[in-house]
């Protein structure tokens, strides 16, 4: 299988108004291949969010190797890093961050609009196809504000897949949902993983959902436990 993500000795330090640096990640190693479905767990303050921001190319490590699809991200400038993020990584958050005045279809089109600059028929067709995949064809022209929490998160999943990413980062994607909706959203991600071979890294505090992943990585005090 193709290698999607490689972390070698990733460290991250911050200097917050003092001359002394505080290291929050201490040499993280992680390898993910195409089709992996991994849970990332750990207590609050363990470094999970910092690690996810680095993997998502929203922040840079202080040192260590971060490679996405075999590309050493340390060799890239900010513009190239933004392009790599947009083309290879999809994001799903605990809160859906949909634009409430936009329809489901318009929300799914947003990553494509950012990439291409203007809407077209191909973009619309792609969004409709993804909404069909997440079971929301009938609601594609509904405003996001008029949808249930479970439906909104399904739209967010469709949006994360808009650019056909190799890696999807899901940060507590079921955290705001009731147990029935959470299970349905988890199963949807699992089905997409199996059908499309999309790699998923899911941050969760839900032990039962984590056990249904292929692998669990636990971060404690900035280290893989």
UniProtKB/Swiss-Prot annotation:
CDD domains: ABC_MJ0796_LolCDE_FtsE (cd03255). It comes from the Bacteria. Keywords: ATP-binding, Cell inner membrane, Cell membrane, Membrane, Nucleotide-binding, Translocase, Transport. GO terms for biological process: lipoprotein localization to outer membrane; protein localization to outer membrane. One of its GO terms (cellular component) is plasma membrane. PROSITE patterns: ABC_TRANSPORTER_1 (PS00211), ABC_TRANSPORTER_2 (PS50893), LOLD (PS51244). ATP binds at residues 42-49. GO terms for molecular function: ATP binding; ATP hydrolysis activity; transmembrane transporter activity. It is a peripheral membrane protein. Pfam families: ABC_tran. Its EC number is 7.6.2.-. SUPFAM superfamilies: P-loop containing nucleoside triphosphate hydrolases. SMART domains: AAA. Its main location: membrane. Residues 5-225 form the ABC transporter domain. The complex is composed of two ATP-binding proteins (LolD) and two transmembrane proteins (LolC and LolE). PANTHER family: IMPORT ATP-BINDING PROTEIN, LIPOPROTEIN-RELEASING SYSTEM ATP-BINDING PROTEIN LOLD. Belongs to the ABC transporter superfamily. Lipoprotein translocase (TC 3.A.1.125) family. This is Lipoprotein-releasing system ATP-binding protein LolD 2. It comes from Rhodopseudomonas palustris (strain BisB18). The gene is lolD2.
């Amino acid at each position: 299988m193709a290698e999607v993500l490689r972390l070698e000795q990733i460290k991250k330090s911050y200097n917050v108004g003092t001359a002394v640096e505080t290291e929050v990640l201490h040499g993280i190693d992680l390898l993910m291949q195409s089709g992996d479905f991994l849970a990332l767990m750990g207590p609050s303050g363990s470094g999970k969010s910092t690690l996810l921001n680095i993997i998502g190319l929203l922040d840079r490590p202080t040192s260590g190797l971060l490679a996405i699809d075999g590309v050493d991200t340390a060799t890239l400038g900010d513009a190239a890093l933004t392009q790599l993020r947009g083309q290879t990584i999809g994001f799903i958050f605990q809160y859906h961050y949909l634009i409430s005045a936009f329809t489901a279809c318009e929300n799914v089109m947003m990553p494509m609009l950012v990439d291409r600059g203007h809407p077209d028929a191909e973009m619309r067709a792609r969004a409709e196809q993804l909404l069909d995949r997440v079971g929301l064809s009938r609601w594609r022209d509904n405003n996001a504000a008029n949808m249930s929490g479970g439906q909104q998160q399904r739209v967010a999943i469709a949006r994360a897949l808009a650019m056909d990413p190799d890696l999807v980062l899901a940060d507590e994607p079921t955290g705001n949902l009731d147990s029935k909706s959470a299970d349905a959203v988890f199963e949807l991600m699992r089905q997409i993983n199996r059908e499309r071979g999309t790699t998923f890294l899911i941050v969760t505090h839900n032990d039962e959902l984590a056990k249904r992943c292929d692998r669990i990585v636990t971060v404690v005090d900035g280290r893989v436990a």
